[in-house]
Design a protein with these regions (language model features):
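Thiol/disulfide oxidoreductase modules built on the thioredoxin-like
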Residues: 111-119, 125-171
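Positively charged n-region of N-terminal signal peptides that target proteins for export
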Residues: 2-10
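Structural microenvironment flanking redox-active thiols in thiol-disulfide oxidoreductases
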Residues: 77-116, 126-133
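Bacterial N-terminal signal peptides
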Residues: 12-20
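Hydrophobic beta-strand core positions in alpha/beta domains
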Residues: 67, 99, 143-144
Length: 175
């Protein structure tokens, strides 16, 4: 009985992955980017390390790159410099890049970002509740929220955001 349940879950997961792969391939999406259903983005109201509040509701009218990460996460550590590299490439009136640290101390976050991404001002999810609400299914995870506040794309795992294929993708969706 237990093997049947495991087999059914495995087959279901494989079908879901095949669907996501086919959807991405049919839309010409870069590797690892999944199209989402356009549901409204969950609430996101957090403070940065200076205590300044940031609310996703006030970002209406522009795309938002919402990135969940942690300093202990190996793929996050490799990916963060590529986010730092794209930060100055896009006008904040078209694309706002938001990096959200998941439940780590400010000292840990400051030490890590000072070394690899000094221009990024992280939002601090100190209690992990925003991360829980967004359900990223692992770290790193990046959601692309459209100007109407709807979830359009998800990238799970690390990727070189500063590579031509991802830069072209972002440029295309924000135009």
């Amino acid at each position: 009985m237990r093997q049947q349940g495991t087999m059914k879950r495995t087959i279901g997961l494989l079908c879901a992955l095949l669907f996501c792969w086919h959807s991405a391939a049919s839309e010409g999406l870069p590797k690892g980017i999944m199209k989402l259903d356009g549901r409204p983005a969950p609430a996101l109201l957090l403070e940065d390390m200076d205590g300044q509040a940031w609310d996703i509701g006030k970002a209406r009218g522009r795309w938002v790159f919402v990135h969940f990460w942690a300093a202990w996460c190996g793929p996050c550590r490799r990916e963060m410099p590529t986010i730092q590299a794209i930060f100055p490439q896009f006008d904040a009136s078209e694309l706002e890049i938001v990096v959200i640290n998941t439940a780590e101390s400010e000292d840990t976050v400051f030490e890590f970002l000072a070394a690899v991404a000094p221009d990024l001002n992280p939002l601090m999810d100190k209690d992990g509740l925003v991360t829980e609400r967004w359900q990223p299914r692992g770290l790193p995870a990046t959601f692309l929220v459209d100007p109407a506040g709807r979830l359009q794309y998800l990238a799970l795992g690390g990727r070189p955001w500063d590579s031509p294929v991802y830069m072209k993708f972002i440029s295309k969706i924000i135009e």
